[in-house]
Regions:
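Hydrophobic faces of well-ordered beta-strands that scaffold small-molecule active sites
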Residues: 66-72, 92-96, 121-125, 154-158, ...
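Acidic-and-aromatic substrate-binding clefts and catalytic sites of carbohydrate-active enzymes
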Residues: 71-81, 95-108, 127-139, 164-168, ...
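Short, acidic/polar
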Residues: 72-88, 108-109, 134-148, 203-214, ...
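Alpha-helical membrane-targeting segments
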Residues: 22-63
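Substrate-binding cleft of extracellular glycoside hydrolase catalytic domains
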Residues: 116-177, 289
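Substrate-binding cleft of secreted/luminal carbohydrate-active enzymes
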Residues: 2-27, 44, 153-156, 264, ...
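Noncatalytic carbohydrate-binding groove/subsite architecture in carbohydrate-active enzymes
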Residues: 172-312
Length: 314
């Protein structure tokens, strides 16, 4: 991050966890949105179950090298070394985060992007905790970011972790409004490839709400921050049956039914945080959530293999 507000943790590159007294109190808008989420899930459940049961795995036809991407960040002072490491790895698909609050200070980002010539870039435009308080400002910030970076890419992933209050959205309805304000920019920028939904972890109710609604936007692909580290390996289950493969299967089944997204699933974030790396990993030292380097490498390899063999992930 170029600029780091007081609510931003520069080590873990995310907003600080909200204290109880800082969490927004429930309002009628929250209750109404929760009701919409529940009703949408209830009405969609039969079709989702059918879609899930009919879905069959089919290994991806992509070159495995094209299937793998890497997320990079700016602001640590070793951008040239990072470019060298990216080239050494041979990875071609890169994701660069640009926070909305850096919209007036983009020179360092464009300089960095210039050094990544020839790479396929996706830019993740991060919302701030204040974005849902001023949607016009949010739109203006996104407009500036796209305008300055459109010479490097037309792929933009909008928002991050919409189901975490510390990122600014008190409920999914606010996230949909952020997406709508970006949709209005299509008349100014042609051939945009927009990713959205942006639900972190496995929360199918909110994923379905973000994919099936009457908001005014369209997505070229669904972005899922599908972390499974709390279940240990990718074969660990949640709710008894949902290991990584079944989580991908359910997410893909919902995308196939979506009236907001094309039938494309991108896993835009996943990882296993490392042991003994505080303050960069806030919960480091907890063996139920963090792993050593050898285990991380093994789990990431399994994750990629499962996702690739399913054929459900782009």
């Amino acid at each position: 991050m170029k600029n780091q507000p007081e609510w931003w943790d520069p080590y873990s590159c995310q907003p600080y966890k909200l204290k109880d007294e800082s969490k927004p109190r429930s309002r009628w808008s929250n209750v109404w949105d929760y009701a919409k989420t529940g009703l949408t899930a209830l009405l969609g459940l039969p079709l989702i179950v059918i879609s899930y049961l009919l879905l069959r795995a089919k290994p991806s036809s992509k070159d495995p090298k094209e299937f793998i991407g890497l997320s990079i960040d700016l602001g640590f002072g070793y951008e040239s070394e990072m470019v060298d490491m990216v080239n050494e790895l041979g990875v071609e698909n890169l994701l660069l985060r640009i926070p909305s609050w850096d919209a007036d200070d983009l020179d360092s980002y464009t300089d960095f992007l210039s050094e990544l010539e020839g790479k396929d870039i996706v830019i993740n435009i991060l919302q701030s905790p204040h974005s849902t308080q001023d949607y016009e400002l949010w739109q203006s910030q996104v407009r500036k970011i796209i305008g300055v970076t459109s010479g490097f890419t037309n792929h933009y992933w909008i928002g991050n972790a919409i189901n975490r209050t510390k990122w600014g959205c008190r409920h999914s309805g606010e996230a949909l409004q952020l997406q709508e304000k970006v949709e209005e920019l299509r008349s100014e920028f042609h051939n945009l490839f927009i990713l959205g939904s942006s639900v972190i972890d496995f929360e199918p109710l909110l994923t379905w709400r973000s994919l099936c609604n009457f908001a005014k936007f369209k997505l070229e692909a669904t972005a899922a921050l599908m972390y499974v580290n709390r279940r240990h390996s990718p074969y660990g289950t949640q709710y008894g049956i949902f290991d990584l493969k079944n989580k991908l299967r359910l997410t893909k089944a919902m995308i196939r039914l979506s009236n907001r997204s094309k039938n494309k699933l991108w896993i835009t974030e996943t990882n296993w945080p490392l042991l003994n790396t505080k303050p960069y990993t806030p919960n480091s030292g907890n063996p139920t959530r963090t792993v050593d380097e050898a285990t991380q490498a093994e789990y990431l390899k399994l994750y990629y293999q499962i996702a690739y063999q399913s054929g459900w992930v782009e």
